[in-house]
């Protein structure tokens, strides 16, 4: 796992791209709990998302799960590959399975997220 990633309580990850944008996906732990992903509902480009609000939906053979925005901002890119290959979320949760890229409204929101070590400790308690 990339130690520069930040995580939410609801198992989303955030990669700071260093230019005021972030890439967002779901953690390996989350995809393991979901099982085989069969569909991903992507938001529209230019959609405004608010930290804590649902912006996407991932459906698996077991369940449908809302994906929550870790930060507030505007969607600048969506992972179109997930339309035809939703299994990328299972196969490459931190790489090919990313969901969106967002231009942040307030980069300070990243400070509220867990680092990789804190996140791993929290899921071991589950």
Curated annotation (Swiss-Prot):
Keywords: Lipoyl. Disulfide bonds: none annotated. It comes from the Bacteria. Residues 21-103 form the Lipoyl-binding domain. SUPFAM superfamilies: Single hybrid motif. GO terms for cellular component: cytosol; glycine cleavage complex. The modification N6-lipoyllysine is found at residue 62. Belongs to the GcvH family. The glycine cleavage system catalyzes the degradation of glycine. The H protein shuttles the methylamine group of glycine from the P protein to the T protein. This is Glycine cleavage system H protein. It comes from Vibrio cholerae serotype O1 (strain ATCC 39315 / El Tor Inaba N16961). The gene is gcvH.
């Amino acid at each position: 796992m990339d130690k520069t990633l930040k995580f939410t309580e609801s198992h989303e990850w955030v990669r700071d791209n260093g230019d005021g944008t972030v890439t967002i996906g779901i953690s390996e732990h989350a995809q393991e709990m979901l099982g085989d992903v069969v569909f991903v509902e992507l938001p529209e480009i230019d959609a405004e998302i608010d930290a804590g609000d649902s912006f996407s939906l991932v459906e698996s053979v077991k369940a449908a799960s809302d994906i929550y925005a870790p930060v507030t901002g505007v969607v600048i890119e969506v992972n179109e590959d997930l339309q035809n290959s939703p299994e990328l979320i299972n196969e490459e949760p931190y790489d090919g399975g990313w969901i969106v890229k967002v231009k942040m409204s307030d980069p300070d929101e990243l400070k509220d997220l867990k680092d990789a070590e804190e996140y791993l400790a929290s899921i071991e308690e589950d």
